[in-house]
Structures are given as structure tokens and as C-alpha cells.
């Protein structure tokens, strides 16, 4: 009986000795949640201040307004912000596009599409945003183009889905600039373009 106890004890000691380096390498013992590392010097996505003015400024260039609803506690928001939203502002396919961010937990005031000043959190609630990140594309009248992009379930296709949403927004901007006969009825001056 003592031979069994001795070999069981030796086996457990060996298992512990050899598995400790593997566990340390794999960080199995860590109590910390996995976080995406974001460069401290990362560019910032501008906060929305006046959605009506920002959407009209984008429309001056034939582009929609792209808004990311996020929160400070959302690690996936950092991924969407750094990999998609910030690069979007300099994407040559969308000259003049404007992308902004709203914090769903913030009481910071922002002007909505009707010109009324509301807290960012109230604006998020008005648009039914409860999960973040959530990206929405808007035309110059504040109408949402297509479906929102909620979360980031598949990074391989996220850019494709974002492009689809933006293209729907571009179509909305272009159709807002035409009468029912198809003739242009809105000039860039109608949006107070610079």
C-alpha cells in the first residue's frame, strides 16, 4: 500500500514540476481577462458633436456619416476603432467621408439630427443601441442606411460588411440629391459645403 502511495505522490510531484513551466508559458493561471493591446499612441476617432452638421458636411462630398457607438469598457470597440473606423477617414475610396464616435455611457452633450442637444447616452438609447461596438451609417437627413454592424463576430468579413453599409449610405446621399424625376435637386450649397 505504501508503494502505491509513494508512486502516486511521485507522479503528482512530477506532473506539477513539468506542468508548471507549460502553464506559465500558456498563462493558464492568470486571473486577468484577455485584452486586446492597443498602442498608447493610437490615433483617436473624433467624438460626434453635431450629427446634423457632420452628416451634411459628409454629404457635400457625396458621402454618408459613419458613427460608432462604443464604451470605455469595451475591448472590441478598440479593435473596430483602430482597424476600421480611423483608417476609414483616409480611405481613398471614400473621399470626404466622416466617421465619429458616441459613448453610450456618456452624459456629454451632442446635437442630434433634429438639431436638439442631448446626452450621448440618450442618443444611443434613441437608436436602440445596447450592444457595442455598433456602427451605423446615416444620410444627411439622419436616416439610417442599411442595418447596423453589431459587434465584430468575424474580422475577416467586417471590412466587407462595412463597405456594404457605406455604399448603401452613398446611394442614400445620392438619391437625396435627386428629385422624383431623377434630376438633381440638391446642390452642395444646400448642405453648407466649405
Locate each region found by the language model.
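Thiol-based oxidoreductase modules, predominantly thioredoxin-like and allied folds used
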Residues: 93-117
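Typically the conserved alpha-helix immediately C-terminal to a functionally engaged Cys/Sec
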Residues: 78-93
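A short beta-strand-turn-helix
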Residues: 47-64
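Solvent-exposed loop/turn segments at secondary-structure junctions
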Residues: 72-76, 84, 104-109, 142-143, ...
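Non-catalytic, surface beta->alpha helical segment in thiol-disulfide oxidoreductase systems
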Residues: 126, 130-131, 136-171
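Structural recognition of the beta-strand scaffold that forms the well-ordered cores
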Residues: 66-68, 98-101, 137
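Short active-site neighborhood of thiol/selenol oxidoreductases, capturing the structured segment around
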Residues: 61-74
Amino acid at each position: 500500500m505504501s508503494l502505491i502511495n509513494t508512486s502516486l505522490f511521485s507522479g503528482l510531484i512530477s506532473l506539477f514540476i513539468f506542468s508548471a513551466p507549460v502553464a506559465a508559458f500558456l498563462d493558464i493561471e492568470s486571473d486577468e481577462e484577455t485584452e486586446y493591446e492597443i498602442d498608447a499612441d493610437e490615433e483617436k476617432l473624433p467624438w460626434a458633436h453635431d450629427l446634423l452638421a457632420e452628416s451634411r458636411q459628409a454629404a457635400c462630398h457625396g458621402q454618408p456619416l459613419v458613427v460608432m457607438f462604443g464604451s470605455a469598457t469595451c475591448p472590441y470597440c478598440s479593435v473596430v476603432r483602430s482597424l476600421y473606423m480611423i483608417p476609414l477617414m483616409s480611405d481613398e475610396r471614400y473621399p470626404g467621408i466622416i466617421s465619429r464616435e458616441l459613448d453610450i455611457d456618456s452624459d456629454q452633450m451632442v446635437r442630434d439630427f433634429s438639431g436638439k442637444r442631448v446626452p450621448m447616452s440618450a442618443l444611443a438609447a434613441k437608436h436602440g443601441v445596447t450592444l457595442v461596438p455598433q456602427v451605423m451609417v446615416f444620410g444627411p437627413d439622419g436616416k439610417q442606411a442599411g442595418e447596423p454592424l453589431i459587434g465584430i463576430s468575424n474580422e475577416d468579413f467586417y471590412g466587407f460588411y462595412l463597405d456594404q453599409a457605406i455604399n448603401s449610405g452613398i446611394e442614400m446621399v445620392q438619391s437625396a440629391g435627386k428629385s422624383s424625376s431623377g434630376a438633381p435637386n440638391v446642390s452642395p450649397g444646400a448642405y453648407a459645403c466649405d
